[in-house]
Amino acid sequence: MSERSLLVVVLAAGEGTRMASRLPKVLHRIAGRSMLHHVLETTRQAGATRVAVVIGPDREDVAAEAHRVRPDAQVFVQTERLGTAHAVLAARAALEEPADDVLVLYADTPLLRPETLENLRAPLADGAAVAVLGFRPADPTGYGRLLTQGDALVAIREEKDATPDERRVDFCNAGVMALRAREALSILTRIGNANAKGEYYLTDAVEIARADGLSAVATEAEVDEVAGVNSRLQLAEAEAILQGRLRRAAMAGGATLVAPETVFLSVDTRLGRDVLVEPNVVFGPGVTVEDDVVIHAFSHLEGAHLERGVSIGPYARLRPGTRLGEGVRIGNFVETKAALIDAGAKVNHLSYVGDAHVGSNANVGAGTITCNYDGFSKHRTEIGAGAFIGTNSSLVAPVSVGAGAYIGSGSVITDDVPADALALGRGRQAVKEGWAAALRAARGKPKV
C-alpha cells in the first residue's frame, strides 16, 4: 500500500432513473451491502486518508449511509447535475486540503478491487499528473476510447467524435481517474462546457494536463471490475459477478459448495474449513461458520454464528442474534432468532426458538414454540441444560425450565419449572367407547 496520502472523491449524485425505484440507485444492495458501501470499503482497503462523497439534492439517506459506513466521510451536495468534473468540484473544500493523490470513483461501480486502485495510483508517484483506468471489452461500441502513444495517454475520445481508426481501438475508458493533488484543482477548474450538452467532463483533464506539459497515463482493469450499474438488469449482472468471486474464495478456503451456482453469500460471510453447504442456501449479512459444519439444502442464515460441528436444515432459518454452540443440531423447518443454543442441544423439527437460551444437551421436541411476544414487548425463555421439551409444547415467556426438567408433550407452560421436575400443562384425555360407531349409525354413510 502506498505511503502517499490519498483523498477519494466518490460521485453518488446520479438520479438513477433507469432503476425505476424510489430508493437511490447507490443504496441498492449487492451481496448484502449497498453499492455505496462496497465502494467506500474498497477505498478503505486501498488506503484512503480522506473520503468525500458527492450527493444530489435532498439525498439525506445517501449521506446517512456514507456516514454509517465511514463516519469521517465529508459529504457535499451537487445542486445541479452539470457533468462529472462539475461533480468533483462540488467537493472543492476537500480538494483544497493537503493530500498527495486524488482518486475519483463512482458509487455505481461497486466491483473494483483495491489492488486495481493501487495500481492506478502508482504512476503518480513516478511523476504522472493524471492516470486513467481502462479496460478491453469484447465489444467496445459506445465506449470512449483511450488513445495512447507508447506509455503515454494522449486523449480520451468519445465514440461519436472518434475517427474510423480511433474506433478500432479496443482500450476503453472506465471513468475512474487519479490525479496528483498539487495539479488537480488547476486542471479541474479549467475544464469547460463547450459541448453539445453544456456539461463539464472529467475526461477533458487529460488534454489539459498534456497542454501544461504534464504526463498522463492509463492502466488496465479486468472487464468485470468496471461494470457500472444503471438498471435492474445490470444490478443482477453485478450480483452474479460478485457471487462468483465469493463462491470461489469460499471454496479456495476449504468449504464445499455442492452446487455453487445455487448458494448466495454476503460479502462478510465467513466459512471455515470442511464446511459443507448443500444446494439453495442463502447467507445474509453477518454470518460466521466455524469448521466442520453441515448446512443442508434450502436454509437461510442471517446474523448468526455457528460453532464447530453444527448441523442445520434442510429448510432451517437462522435469524439475527442466533448463536449455535459446538455440535448443535437444528433440523427441518426450525426458526431461531436472538437465540443462544449451547453445545450438544437439539431442536430437530418444526419449532420456533426466539429470545431464548437453550442449555447444553437439551432436547427441544417437534412443534415447540417459545411464545416470546405479548403484543407489546419481547420476553425471554430459559431452558436449562439437559432439559427435555416434549413435542407440540408452548413455552409462554417470560418462563424458565430448569436443568434436567421434562415437559410433557402438548403442554402450555406459563410458570417456571424447577430443575429435574416434570411439568404437564394440558387437558386430560377422555375416551368414549363406541361413540364413533353410534355417530355413523345415526348419520349414515359419509358423503364424499
From Swiss-Prot:
Residues 254-448 are annotated as: N-acetyltransferase. Pathway: Nucleotide-sugar biosynthesis; UDP-N-acetyl-alpha-D-glucosamine biosynthesis; N-acetyl-alpha-D-glucosamine 1-phosphate from alpha-D-glucosamine 6-phosphate (route II): step 2/2; Nucleotide-sugar biosynthesis; UDP-N-acetyl-alpha-D-glucosamine biosynthesis; UDP-N-acetyl-alpha-D-glucosamine from N-acetyl-alpha-D-glucosamine 1-phosphate: step 1/1; Bacterial outer membrane biogenesis; LPS lipid A biosynthesis. Its cofactor is Mg(2+). Residues 1-232 are annotated as: Pyrophosphorylase. Gene3D superfamilies: Hexapeptide repeat proteins, Spore Coat Polysaccharide Biosynthesis Protein SpsA, Chain A. CDD domains: GT2_GlmU_N_bac, LbH_GlmU_C. The active site is at H349. Its main location: cytoplasm. Binds 1 Mg(2+) ion per subunit. Mg(2+) binds at D108, N230. GO terms for biological process: cell morphogenesis; cell wall organization; lipid A biosynthetic process; peptidoglycan biosynthetic process; regulation of cell shape; UDP-N-acetylglucosamine biosynthetic process. It catalyses: alpha-D-glucosamine 1-phosphate + acetyl-CoA = N-acetyl-alpha-D-glucosamine 1-phosphate + CoA + H(+); N-acetyl-alpha-D-glucosamine 1-phosphate + UTP + H(+) = UDP-N-acetyl-alpha-D-glucosamine + diphosphate. Keywords: Acyltransferase, Cell shape, Cell wall biogenesis/degradation, Cytoplasm, Magnesium, Metal-binding, Multifunctional enzyme, Nucleotidyltransferase, Peptidoglycan synthesis, Repeat, Transferase. In the N-terminal section; belongs to the N-acetylglucosamine-1-phosphate uridyltransferase family. This is Bifunctional protein GlmU. It comes from Azorhizobium caulinodans (strain ATCC 43989 / DSM 5975 / JCM 20966 / LMG 6465 / NBRC 14845 / NCIMB 13405 / ORS 571). The lineage of its organism: Bacteria, Pseudomonadati, Pseudomonadota, Alphaproteobacteria, Hyphomicrobiales. The gene is glmU.
